């Protein structure tokens, strides 16, 4: 019958193997062994060749069959899932009568689990890895070989189940014993066997395998709880109605010392409110703590051993020591301390690592021009290119813009500026003049053309940038400050906002525009000082001087910082200009560099005086050139283009209106240059001037008359039109400053409005001894522009109507105020004699205002009639 079963099951190989194995284990006699030996070899060979991936290594062997031992049966049952499901689902190992439980440690490499499986892997992947790396033929390498060697052969026990605890490096071994043998004797025999025959696993040859009897009811769980040498022992009552005892240190020491060296025992304070009561037991090694936890968890201490009247049950779990995870928890739980400290560390790292790099790049920016000019290879290449250009294109003049006439007229200013740079005067140099007067060209192309070290900062680019990040990036690019993480400022602001919500105050991660600009200018000052001192030698005549004394003694060696467009689009509280002025004052006072300000704003003295209050500034004012110089400039420009071969020389009759056109344009360099370009393009001087006037008229209409008014605007359309009309009608092209301030449209904040219009370059204010005296057009050509704008009758009538409407509205408000006071005086029961003059004055005011209204209405009617007649 057994043969029939085997033959019937031989087709599916795996089922045949299982039936064969089961029958062999159940009927393990000699007849069956000899009957199935040949079938076993053939069946194993077929299973290896057909389905090797599904057959365990134990079956893939050519060796003859041997009767399975008890430990072999343990091996087969060990990797099955039926037992695992049982104790994982219940959390406990059920023990029947005559059954016991041992815990064996140091049989799994708990320290090397990260090599065997991922952090999210389960127990199954770990078992598979152990199967792959275990080598049964090596001593103490197979975990089941270790278990077999732990239990003495002469000990009459049968191993029923092995429950691994991979994280703790051990396993529970469930066994059955005869009725006349107790668990304590079995434990003693096993320990004696290990003492005589110690076992050292392959992964830890310096420590031995240890075994202890489980006297509690261990909790088998697969939670993510890592072993620790520190245990938390909680004292629970046996039943809900009973009470647990608070074990003292001596009792705990007696209970836990057999499992290993104890480092410390810490009991709960007597006044502690936490229940159940607990104590901390810290072992010297984690394996001792694992042994104690697995053997003592669930153990009930009887009354005679200090467990109280009804006994005390121990519940044990690992208490994690202060390691990285606890440091992380502490950091997360104390943001008021951590966030400011992180901000300080970040600032320290920035200063230590990035600031030297930034200073180095600024030095490269300062010396970039000089390095190119002094490089012999670059000089040779430049010379060869110039020779080739002369051969191919012909020799060109040295002044392509024809500015020689301008520089000859301003040679005195150039010489004065160069002499100031050789003097040791701790003050600013200011070059003031209207836009287009040639300030930048005079400084950079003439006065500083042969100067070694110079750096130019254009305030217009910084001030016109939108947002703090853009301003920081522009300022950094001006001086070569890199690396700059301007985009991090926005992210840091969000972090600061979140920190403010958590701790109530800002953490300081984000730096304000003020702080960022301070860092940029401070690094620039450091680079300027290094550049000046790098050529100083130890054996020169000034070697005995300190760096500060050396800088003071050699003003000719200092770099020059040119700050262009100073006070462009400035407001009352501009951080950009405040930091630049403060930094420039430090450069000047410390003899680090000469500072030259180029500005069109006449109020430059106010912010600069705050930075250097006790200094007298060196000032050069550039105005419009004279008629003679303007003619020379235009003619030299045209002569250069003729020599270049691009245009033919103009005949004298074609330039007969040149003087009149130059007089109409005035001496503004940019306007004269534009006219010269138009003449080169084939236009007559008069046509070029008309084109300039038309373009300027369009700009005036757009900026001051037709664009809707904004809150930031400090003037009204009516005020701008009033000045345009008055300047167009004036004989000498100027108005009295005091007369305009006292006019009806400028009585309220008149001076502020005039300064704003001057800043917008509609007008210019001429001062005598520091006091405003005359009002003129912003540039000479604007006088002709104003005349052209006022020739538009429709526009003129509409703007005059707006002015008259404002005047009528103002007089009506005055009459309302006078009438309110008259009504108040009329409500008195009797009229005192002292009020007669006041009443008469009010009546006269009402009469005067009413006459003005009547006059304005007549003018308004006339203007409306003109406006209706225009098509």
Curated annotation (Swiss-Prot):
Its main location: mitochondrion. One of its GO terms (cellular component) is mitochondrial inner membrane. It is found in: Mitochondrion inner membrane. GO terms for molecular function: RNA binding. The keyword Zinc does not apply. Residues 229-321 form the RRM domain. One of its GO terms (biological process) is mRNA processing. Plays a role in maintaining the mitochondrial genome and in controlling the mtDNA escape. Involved in the regulation of mtDNA nucleotide structure and number. May have a dispensable role in early maturation of pre-rRNA. This is Mitochondrial escape protein 2. It comes from Aspergillus fumigatus (strain ATCC MYA-4609 / CBS 101355 / FGSC A1100 / Af293). The gene is yme2.
């Amino acid at each position: 019958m057994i043969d029939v079963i085997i033959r019937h099951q031989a087709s599916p190989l795996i089922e045949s193997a299982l039936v064969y194995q089961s029958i062999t284990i159940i009927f393990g006699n000699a007849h069956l062994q000899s009957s199935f030996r040949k079938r076993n070899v053939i069946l194993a060979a077929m299973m290896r060749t057909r389905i090797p991936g599904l057959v365990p290594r134990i079956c893939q062997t050519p060796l003859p069959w041997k009767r399975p031992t008890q430990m072999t049966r343990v091996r087969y049952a060990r990797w099955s899932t039926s037992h695992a499901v049982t104790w994982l689902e219940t959390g406990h190992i059920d023990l029947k009568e005559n059954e016991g439980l041992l815990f064996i440690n140091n049989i799994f490499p708990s320290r090397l689990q990260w090599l065997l499986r991922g952090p999210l892997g389960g127990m199954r992947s770990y078992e598979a890895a152990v199967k792959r790396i275990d080598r049964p033929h090596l001593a103490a390498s197979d975990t089941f070989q270790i278990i077999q060697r732990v239990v003495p052969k002469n000990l009459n026990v049968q191993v029923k189940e092995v429950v691994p605890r991979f994280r703790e490096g051990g396993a529970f071994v469930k066994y059955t014993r005869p009725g006349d043998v107790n668990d304590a004797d079995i434990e003693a025999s096993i320990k004696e066997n290990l003492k005589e025959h110690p076992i050292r696993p392959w992964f830890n040859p310096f420590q031995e395998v240890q075994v202890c009897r489980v006297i509690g009811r261990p909790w088998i769980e697969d939670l993510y709880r890592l072993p620790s040498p520190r245990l938390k022992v909680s004292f629970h009552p046996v039943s809900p109605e009973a009470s647990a005892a608070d074990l003292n240190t001596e009792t705990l020491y007696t209970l836990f010392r057999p499992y290993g060296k104890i480092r410390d025992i810490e009991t709960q304070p007597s006044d502690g409110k936490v229940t159940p009561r607990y104590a901390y037991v810290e072992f010297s090694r984690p394996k001792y703590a694992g042994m104690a936890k697995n053997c003592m968890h669930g153990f009930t201490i009887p009354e005679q051993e200090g467990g109280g009247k009804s006994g005390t049950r121990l519940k044990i779990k690992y208490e994690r020591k202060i390691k990285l995870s606890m440091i992380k928890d502490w950091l997360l739980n104390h943001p008021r301390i951590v966030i400011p400290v992180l901000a300080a560390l970040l600032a320290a790292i920035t200063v230590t690592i990035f600031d030297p790099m930034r200073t180095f790049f600024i030095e490269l920016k300062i010396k970039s021009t000089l390095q190119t000019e002094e490089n012999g290879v670059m000089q040779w290449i430049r010379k060869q290119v110039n020779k080739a250009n002369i051969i191919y294109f012909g020799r060109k003049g040295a002044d392509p813009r024809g500015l020689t006439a301008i520089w000859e007229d301003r040679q005195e200013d150039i010489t004065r500026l160069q002499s100031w740079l050789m003097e040791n005067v701790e003050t600013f140099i200011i070059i003031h003049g209207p836009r287009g007067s040639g300030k930048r060209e005079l400084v950079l192309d003439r006065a500083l053309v042969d100067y070694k070290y110079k750096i130019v900062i254009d305030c217009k680019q910084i001030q016109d940038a939108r947002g703090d990040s853009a301003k920081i990036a522009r300022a950094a690019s001006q001086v070569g400050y890199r690396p700059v993480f301007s985009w991090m400022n926005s992210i840091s602001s969000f972090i600061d906002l979140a920190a403010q919500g958590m701790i109530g105050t800002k953490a300081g991660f984000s730096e304000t525009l003020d702080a960022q600009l301070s860092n940029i200018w401070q690094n620039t000052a450091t680079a300027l000082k290094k550049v000046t001192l790098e050529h100083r030698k130890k054996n020169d005549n000034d070697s005995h001087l300190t760096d500060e004394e050396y800088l003071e003694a050699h003003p000719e060696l200092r770099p020059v910082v040119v700050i262009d467009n100073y006070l462009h689009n400035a407001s009352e509280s501009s951080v950009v200009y405040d930091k630049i002025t403060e930094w420039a004052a430090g450069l000047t006072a410390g003899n680090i560099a000469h500072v030259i300000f180029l500005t069109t704003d006449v109020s430059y003295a106010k912010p600069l005086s705050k930075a250097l209050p006790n200094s007298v500034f060196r000032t050069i004012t550039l105005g419009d050139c004279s008629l003679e110089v303007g003619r020379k400039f235009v003619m030299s420009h045209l002569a250069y283009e003729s020599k270049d071969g691009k245009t033919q020389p103009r005949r004298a009759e074609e330039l007969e209106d040149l003087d009149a056109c130059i007089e109409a344009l005035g001496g503004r360099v940019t306007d004269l240059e534009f006219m010269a370009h138009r003449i080169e393009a084939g236009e007559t001087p008069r046509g070029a001037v008309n084109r300039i006037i038309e373009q300027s008229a369009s700009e005036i209409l757009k900026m001051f008359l037709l664009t809707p008014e904004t809150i930031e605007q400090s003037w009204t359309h009516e005020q701008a039109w009033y000045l345009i009309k008055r300047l167009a009608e004036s004989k000498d092209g100027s108005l009295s400053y005091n007369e305009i301030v006292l006019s009806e449209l400028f009585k309220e904040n008149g001076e502020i409005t005039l300064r704003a219009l001057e800043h917008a370059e509609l007008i210019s204010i001429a001062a005598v001894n520091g006091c405003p005296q005359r009002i003129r057009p912003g540039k000479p050509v604007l006088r002709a522009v104003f005349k052209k704008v006022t020739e538009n009758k429709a526009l003129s009538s509409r703007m005059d109507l707006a002015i008259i409407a404002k005047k009528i509205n103002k007089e009506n408000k005055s009459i309302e105020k006078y009438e309110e006071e008259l009504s108040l005086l009329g409500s008195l029961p009797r009229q005192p004699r002292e009020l007669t003059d006041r009443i008469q004055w009010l009546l006269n005011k009402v009469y005067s205002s009413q006459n003005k209204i009547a006059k304005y209405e007549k003018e308004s009617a006339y203007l409306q009639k003109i406006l209706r007649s225009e098509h």
